[in-house]
C-alpha cells in the first residue's frame, strides 16, 4: 500500500471515530472477543451508511467491506471505498469478480465486513437474509464476528 493511502486511512479512521464518539456517543462492547489474526467476517445489521466505516474504525485491525457498486456514484462514498479497500458488488447480475476478490482476501487472512440483509434495514423491508456469509465461511474457514449496531438515529443522545 502506498504511503499516501496509509496516511489517508489514519486520518479518515480517526475522523470517523471522533465523529461517532462525540455525535453518537459511540460505545464498543465485547472488543476483547474480536480475533486479532486470521480471516474474520464481521457480520452485522445494516441501519445506515455509517455502519461499514463504524466497523472499520472499531475492529482494531484492517477491515475491508462489501458495498453495492452504485455507491461509487457518490464521490465521498467512493473516496471511503478507496481508503478502506471496499469490494464492490454488482447486485443486478451474477457477477463473480466480487466473490473471487472476497475469497482471495479471506484466504490471505484479511477481514471483511458484510451485512447479510444486503441493504439497509433489509429485514424491516421484507428482504430475506443473504447466504454470502455462510458461503465464505464454508469456503475459507473464516471466523464470524457478530456485530450489533444499536442507536444512531438521534445524534447527541
Task: Give residue spans per PLM region.
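Soluble catalytic domains of membrane acyltransferases
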Residues: 5-8, 13, 20-157
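Short, Lys/Arg-rich, polar N-terminal cytosolic tail immediately upstream
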Residues: 1-3
Amino acid at each position: 500500500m502506498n504511503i499516501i493511502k496509509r496516511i489517508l486511512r489514519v486520518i479518515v479512521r480517526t475522523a470517523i471515530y471522533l465523529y461517532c464518539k462525540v455525535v453518537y456517543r459511540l460505545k464498543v462492547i465485547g472488543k476483547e472477543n474480536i480475533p486479532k489474526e486470521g480471516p474474520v467476517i464481521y457480520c452485522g445489521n445494516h441501519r445506515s451508511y455509517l455502519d461499514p466505516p463504524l466497523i472499520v474504525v472499531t475492529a482494531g485491525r484492517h477491515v475491508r467491506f462489501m458495498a453495492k457498486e452504485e455507491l461509487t456514484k457518490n464521490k465521498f462514498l467512493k473516496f471511503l471505498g478507496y481508503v478502506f479497500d471496499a469490494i464492490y458488488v454488482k447486485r443486478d447480475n451474477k457477477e463473480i469478480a466480487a466473490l473471487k476478490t472476497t475469497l482471495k482476501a479471506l484466504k490471505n487472512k484479511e477481514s471483511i465486513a458484510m451485512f447479510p440483509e444486503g441493504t439497509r434495514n433489509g429485514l424491516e423491508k421484507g428482504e430475506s437474509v443473504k447466504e454470502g456469509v455462510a458461503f465464505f465461511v464454508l469456503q475459507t474457514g473464516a471466523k464470524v464476528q457478530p456485530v450489533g449496531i444499536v442507536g444512531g438515529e438521534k445524534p447527541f443522545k
